[in-house]
């Protein structure tokens, strides 16, 4: 499935503006904007593609309701606006590397898979990546997107500084070192505070990674050795369709050290794969990153999918729920009982670990977490009936949904599960007192009474 291409900025000049919004003035097909999965059509009638901060400031002065748009990888309306979307696609550069501070500064719309090779050539790496390298930095961090690893925080945890433009046109810089609480509130900001223009990320010396895959892990082995299995590599993912009392695949990603050895033919009863695999076993692994223990650069092994390929198996929907790691086995057992309900609409589920962080609106705030991800067939009518059942099963564990994916959790329940929500609302009102960045998603899920 190819991504929808955004319309090009009109060359017509509008009085008081450096460029005009893209609005429905030509054929409908050219003006329809959807997310990458194609399940959501954006409703904002105006669309801008500024190339500089000055152009962004010009847009901010004339736009009313507005919202930043990144790489369109969210499955809901979090990035939509009743009036204007402002794309960060032209803010896509690696700006600088500070070798003393061990940080890299990139523009907000930079995609991990695009700047990672450049960073690697300089001898540096990020601590982790998500399963897709196609996502933009600001959007990923604003929604607490993550990879896996019991000691690895989500992508937001690498952020040490950010620059954002507020509704008033003020350029605000916040850093982990100097701004403490404001910073912890702003990093996972859900697009509520302003438009991020650049971010500074922690880096480390570059490293290589190998992937070893195992198939058909017996369910009882997982229950008996859950923590051992998920700690068996730097980053570990479990794939399951909730059928046949087994985990279909175990992906173990390990940093390559001088003493790194083969994991052998067996992992707690799962057998080593004999060829490269797609998470959905029946699909071709052509678009997946290299496996079979072949070492490679961190940015070509930590994601599941190659940058040059469309990762999707076709049109799909996604949901994900985070539970405290201490309750992971109980949560798994609760979901496993729902296998017959989940399976008919499921493509695949993935189970990952994420280390705790301190961001106010992060699902992993103050808790090491296990995330249960669902890739669904694109049948929202049926999936929307299953989600409340999943959420009910996970309710005893105070499960928190991924902000950029699909969920049906009652907003009042979200309010209970995010202790810092009142403080976050104060922060949002401080930077956006007139609510220019509010939209249906925020009104429903965040600005709840």
Give residue spans per PLM region.
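Noncatalytic alpha-helical scaffold of FAD-dependent oxidoreductases
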Residues: 2-449
């Amino acid at each position: 499935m190819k991504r929808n291409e955004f319309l090009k900025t009109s060359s017509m000049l509008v009085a008081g503006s450096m460029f005009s919004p893209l609005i429905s003035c030509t054929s409908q097909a050219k003006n329809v904007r959807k997310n990458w999965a194609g399940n959501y059509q954006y409703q904002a009638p105006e669309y801008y593609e500024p190339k500089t901060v000055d152009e962004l400031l010009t847009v901010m002065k004339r736009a009313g309701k507005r919202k930043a748009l990144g790489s369109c990888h969210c499955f809901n309306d979090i990035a939509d606006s009743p009036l204007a979307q402002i794309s960060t696609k032209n803010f896509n550069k690696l700006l600088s590397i500070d070798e003393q501070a061990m940080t890299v500064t990139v523009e907000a719309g930079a995609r991990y898979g695009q700047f990672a090779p450049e960073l690697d050539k300089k001898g540096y790496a990020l601590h982790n990546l998500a399963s897709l390298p196609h996502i933009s930095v600001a959007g990923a961090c604003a929604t607490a997107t993550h990879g896996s690893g019991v000691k690895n925080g989500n992508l937001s945890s690498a952020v040490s500084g950010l620059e954002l433009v507020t509704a008033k046109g003020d350029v605000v810089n916040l850093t982990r070192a100097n701004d403490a609480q404001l910073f912890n509130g702003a990093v996972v900001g859900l697009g509520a505070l302003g438009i991020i223009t650049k971010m500074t990320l922690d880096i480390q010396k570059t490293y290589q990674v190998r992937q070893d895959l195992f198939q058909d892990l017996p369910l009882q082995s997982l229950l008996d050795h859950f923590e051992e299995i998920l700690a068996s590599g730097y980053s570990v993912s479990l794939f399951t369709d909730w059928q046949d009392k087994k985990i279909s695949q175990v992906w173990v990603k390990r940093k390559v050290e001088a003493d790194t050895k083969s994991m052998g033919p067996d992992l707690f009863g799962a057998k080593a794969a004999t060829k490269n695999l797609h998470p959905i076993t029946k699909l071709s692994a052509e678009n997946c990153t290299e496996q079979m223990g072949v070492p490679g650069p961190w940015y070509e092994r930590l994601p599941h999918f190659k940058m040059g390929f469309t990762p999707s198996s076709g049109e799909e929907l996604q949901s994900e729920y985070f539970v405290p790691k201490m309750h992971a086995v109980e949560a798994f057992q609760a979901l496993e009982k729902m296998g017959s309900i989940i399976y008919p609409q499921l493509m695949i589920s993935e189970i990952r670990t994420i280390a705790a962080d301190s961001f106010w609106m992060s699902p992993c705030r103050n808790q090491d977490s296990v995330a249960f991800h669902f890739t669904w067939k694109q049948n929202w009518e049926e999936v929307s009936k299953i989600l409340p059942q999943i959420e009910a099963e996970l309710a005893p564990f105070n499960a928190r949904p991924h902000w950029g994916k699909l969920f049906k959790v009652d907003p009042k329940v979200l309010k209970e599960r995010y202790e810092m929500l009142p403080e976050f609302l104060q922060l949002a009102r401080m930077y956006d007192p007139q609510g220019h960045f509010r939209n249906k998603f925020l009104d429903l899920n965040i600005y709840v009474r």
